[in-house]
Amino acid sequence: VVRLRSPGNEENKIVFDDCIKGKIEMPENDEDFVILKSDGIPTYHFAHAVDDHLMRTTHVLRGDEWISSVPKHIQLFKLLGFKVPKYGHISPIMKLENGAKRKISKRKDPELGLDYYRSEGYLPEAVFEYLMTVLNSNFEEWRDQNPDSPIDDFEFTLEKMSNSGALFDSL
């Protein structure tokens, strides 16, 4: 394996402005971590930095389970001389199961696939409208004020996304 020798010190803090969660302060990464596995395949951390640099990615939006990796990613981008993208971490969509909440799963839950809604007779526009109410806190109010406007007129903003996971309630 190939490891990155971290020059970091966990007593130092990094601060970044998450596009969804706001200002986050964390200890700087001081852990040496694998960037190439023994089979020569890059780890997610290394691939993320190189691929996003080459693709000129400006914003990385991903699940909030990746927040703890941001110090590694910022360190890696800086050590490689790459511009650090803006990060936004999205809370998972939750589902009630046996009275408890759990993260909805693309493997376990058919309602995450569009084919499910097609087979149930939902119009694509209705599914899209529902998703917008889950994703952006001001969409429902906008729709009430603009019932005949095309959805493309709605100004989607990351700042209006919820900090906590929405509860998905299928009928």
Regions found by a protein language model. Give the residues of each.
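Catalytic adenosine-cofactor/nucleotide-binding cores of aminoacyl-tRNA synthetases and other
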Residues: 68, 80-171
